[in-house]
Amino acid sequence: MDLKEISTALDQLDLSKYELIKKEEIADIHSAGLLLKHKKSGARVVVLSNDDENKVFSIGFKTPPFNDTGLQHIMEHSTLCGSRKYPVKDPFVELCKGSLNTFLNAMTYPDKTVYPVASCNLADFKNITDVYMDAVFYPNIYQREQIFKQEGWHYELDSIDSPLKYNGVVFNEMKGVYSSPDDVLSRDTFVSLFPDTAYRFESGGEPSHIPELSYEDFLAYHKKWYHPANSYIYLYGDFDVQERLDYLDNEYLKNFDANDVQIDADIAMQRPFDILKEETHYYAVTEDEPLENNTYLSYNKVVGTALDKKLYLAMQILDYVLVMAPGAKLKQALIDKGIGTDIYSSLESSVLQPVYSIVAKNAEESQKKAFVDTIEEVLRDIAKNGIDKRMALAGMNYYEFKFREADYGAYPKGLMYYLTMMDSWLYDENEPFIHVQALDTFAQLRKELDEGLFEELIQKYLLDNSHGSLIALVPKRGLEEEKAAEEAKRLETYKNSLSKEELEAIVADTAALKAYQDEPSPQEELERIPMLKLSDIEREPAKLYIDKKSIADVDVIHHNLFTNQIAYLMLAFDCKKVPDELLPYVGLLSSVLGLMDTHKHTYPELTNEININSGGISTDAAIYTDSKDFSKYTVMYEVKGKVLYEKLPFVLEMMHEIIYETKFEDEKRLREIIARIKSRMESNMTGSGHTVAMLSAMAQFSPSSYYSDILRGYQYYEFIEKADRDFDSMKEMLAENLKRTAALIFTKENLTVSFTAEDDGLELLQKPMTEFVAKLARLQEKDAVRTFRPVKEKTAYTSSSQVQYVARCGNYRKAGYEYTGALKVLKIIFSYDYLWLNVRVKGGAYGCMSGFYRNGDTYMVSYR
């Protein structure tokens, strides 16, 4: 529908229950926007009306923390554990079982808590909206203290003679969070920069402080802060706007009065410092982890406010030029001086005063001065002599392309617009739209690039700005044991202070909580959860557009879809000629291609050209199981690009250059890449250990999982760790094997193409693809023989984490079962009945999941 028509329709609304603050046509996201305030309750409401069938609702609250107990986080969990209309213990889980939602979750931020849902099905959208609205305003936390104990924390004592323990979902979740040095560093950074504001507190909760939260304070917080007068309600998509606004008023908002509460939710501005603050903190490592070259150094600056529309985007582009882009000047200067092996940055813009951080990982504490001196030396040079304008243009195009494309993977774009809007709306209730009206800002930034804008920003916010900190996060052996001992001693001291009667009361409370958790919700409560009828569901499945074509004797799978003149191209090369011993190099290629010099461009130049002229080129390895014979699988190497139709010749030219002309013999660059891969994999394993455990377990019996493990799992990490450790003795072999692997992969015989665009896009692909194929190598080489040998080993990997990640895997086909649609149902039963009840609810772990693949592989996983 035309935007004018959508906007005109909004003019016909009866808004008698609401005050219209503003109405805007937001062409950048093809939406007509309304900013409203509910007259009686004071609720703030934004409507983005458009033709997107993936409808989004969210209600959020401004929830700045005032201590480290994690009250806000525990409240987020607890509100979804039953309510007035839906008293079932876990309405969230029941919705997961029977909803067609495209998103269903809740999130706690440093200063807000949001409850977003999304669905393409209108009946489903209305159902889940109502469950969430009832949950936040009428939760069962007042009637069931067990909810607070289960989701937050409780004392656990099975008998008088047993050791006293803490347990609770949030308590265990945050132990997992604080096992990651990256998360510890982020926390230390905020404490250092905001000593006088709410941001010095951990809204998620620090494990040592979570048990300080009382049930009474918990209830008082909800009564005051979870009121419509403190709420931010969002409606997005294609629906009857009048019906939704009337629903909000009639079912909920009219029952509240803004005058009933006095909420001072304003977040204070931190007074700037006179000088840069320096602090040293510690993180835990195991006895066999090194102390040398294992320190994090973080240079942090507070940059303006989130309400500065131009600065909001300009800092993203400046970050791209300084650190994010391959070969970025500041990053390269630190690496060249040996200050860390992995340089990364973060821009936290979802707070009132955004924070920009530059981090050197795998550094030494003694390098603090050199770290700061190098950063400021590079910044002064850029401020004086000018920014790399071509790299800045590449950064602008990169972010503008992402904004226009609005492809956020598993996250609906309407959800991402809401989170972006909250970056301004939370701090100025009259300005929700400024950050989703971005195209004029991009145009302004392009204009001001030649006028010294970015040089001025560097001078003002990074060089002349003393509101900053330098954090050294230093490894410490035995720290985890110290924390565990402190917790055990605290519990033992408390236990020894109790009388026999008090101990018996805790034992009884423990048993009562477990009994509550064991008891299923009554059938009459379960039946109150709104479920879709068959009549609510489209009988016809979504159409798959798959049309097999041929260009220059190469198979092309065409997906004829509307893409707004953007072509999505994937070159998929079969790796059947790559022997087992070279398969780790297939994984390594995905981190090397496009990030090393070619015979035509340096790698920074290459990245600039790609990002200025396209939406990016990426490469990766993948494994596909045969859809008819599940014992067969194929290792593929995929080269992907997205461009406007007229740029198809360019993207194919760049792909050819990357796969054939990369200079693998550049030892210095190869060493940098391998060190960075090792660093990133170690960080990912700390935070996502369940994926490592799952793949390692399935690799014991599943050929496809075994080879996936070689390409991206723990076996790949072992390969990378050895390459990093023994680089000097392996460097020639590494370069030679990369060349050999690329030669075995990138041939015409191995190529299949996937192309997503309309027919006119396919027509424009014909000529450049024919030319590309003509330049492909031919290779007469026998197919490699795969030598998978199943083993049955129970494996454990140790780390300094306070929590465990556990996976149990098997293959149901080997047990005599076939794949049917019933396994989709069984997955829901396993995940949301058996595992949820036993692992999360009763065990206190943060997460659990299960799955069944068509080839028979199955898994059950718990984490944190």
Where are these regions (language model features)?
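Non-catalytic terminal extensions that flank enzyme cores
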Residues: 2-56
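His/Glu-based metal-binding/catalytic segments typifying zinc-dependent metallopeptidases
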Residues: 46-60, 171-183, 261-327, 412-431, ...
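M16 family metallopeptidases and their MPP-like homologs
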Residues: 54-64, 90-138, 145-156, 183-208, ...
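Active-site His/Glu-centered metal-binding helix of metallohydrolases
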Residues: 71, 75-79, 589
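Hydrophobic, small-residue-rich alpha-helical packing segments that form membrane-like cores
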Residues: 156-230, 234-287, 291-293, 298
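Non-catalytic, conformational "gating/processing" segments within enzyme and secreted inhibitor domains
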Residues: 219-251, 734-769
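Extended, regular secondary-structure scaffolds
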Residues: 220-222, 226, 232, 241-262, ...
